[in-house]
């Protein structure tokens, strides 16, 4: 049986959850039905994600550590440089994933399922996502 959604996100880790979070925060999507398909929701990745970013952003709630200076150090040279506009930030994946999933699970227009995506059938006006247990 085919179940219809306006948007389907395949994968619920870093890139999928960043996309889902941006959709969640955008009122243009309030009347859209969004499905997130993830093969294994019970085992969140235990990783750290690091990135460069301007001082303040919407990701700061998830940042566990940040650096505002660089140190170049060798036996013959040492230089510490302060980063003016950017900082290097670190997020722990487990906290990020749990926080975003909790927010999305409480939304009326998001559905999260655990299933294995097998493939896609694309036509002119739609895409069918085939999983082990269904078609969307």
Which role does the model predict for each range below?
Residues 13, 50, 66, 87-90:
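Residue-level preference for alpha-helix termini and adjacent loops
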Residues 73-136:
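Conserved N-terminal helical subregion
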Residues 1-15, 35-37:
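Beta1/beta-strand and adjacent pyrophosphate-binding region of the FAD-binding site
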Residues 18, 22-77, 95:
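N-terminal FAD cofactor-binding segment of flavoenzymes
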Residues 3-5, 10, 30, 113, ...:
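Residue-level preference for short coil/turn positions at secondary-structure junctions
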Residues 1-5, 25-31, 106, 132:
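Short, Lys/Arg-enriched, disordered terminal segments
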Residues 5-7, 51, 88, 136:
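Aromatic side chains
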